[in-house]
């Protein structure tokens, strides 16, 4: 008789966690960034100051999509800044903030699918015209959103119980 190979034993603990990827995409489609991340001076302000996100000018009512899957941390209104805003936590630990919205279509705790519509472009709060203010935060600190757009992030997949 031919020799029989011993059974193969799975050693998942050595293989590491199962992973998958998420991709951050532009929250407004078809419109360019008109105000970049970093120091800027607005015509209505005396001094330059840090701009902690990017602005994407688009017509009032243009759809805004989540940059990646995640869960809504909070929504609200900030009269002195963001106006109507949404903050989302993503599986890679980053958070995104969408400001100056004319309408919010999600609520705190909602789970979001990739590129799900979450609201509409507006000009609420401290704003000079319709646009989306978009921020990305890592460990609570703002990072340049253009550094994460169209970038793939590998995340661990939790085993099902």
Set out the residue ranges of the language-model regions.
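Non-catalytic extracellular/periplasmic "stalk"
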Residues: 1-30, 160
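Catalytic cores of peptidoglycan-degrading enzymes
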Residues: 22-160
């Amino acid at each position: 008789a031919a020799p029989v190979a011993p059974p193969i034993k799975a050693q998942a603990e050595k293989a590491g966690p199962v992973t998958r990827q998420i991709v951050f995409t532009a929250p407004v489609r078809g419109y360019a960034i008109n105000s970049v991340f970093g120091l800027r001076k607005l015509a209505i302000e005396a001094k330059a100051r840090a701009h902690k996100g990017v602005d994407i000018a688009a017509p009032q009512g243009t759809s805004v999509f989540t940059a990646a899957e995640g869960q809504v941390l909070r929504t609200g209104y900030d009269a002195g800044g963001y106006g109507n805003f949404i903050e989302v936590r993503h599986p890679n630990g980053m958070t995104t903030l969408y400001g100056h919205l004319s309408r919010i279509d999600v609520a705190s705790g909602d789970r979001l699918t990739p590129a799900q519509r979450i609201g509409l472009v507006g000009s609420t709060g401290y704003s000079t015209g319709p646009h989306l203010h978009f921020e990305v935060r890592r460990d609570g600190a703002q990072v340049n959103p253009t550094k994460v757009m169209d970038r793939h992030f590998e995340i661990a997949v939790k085993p099902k119980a």
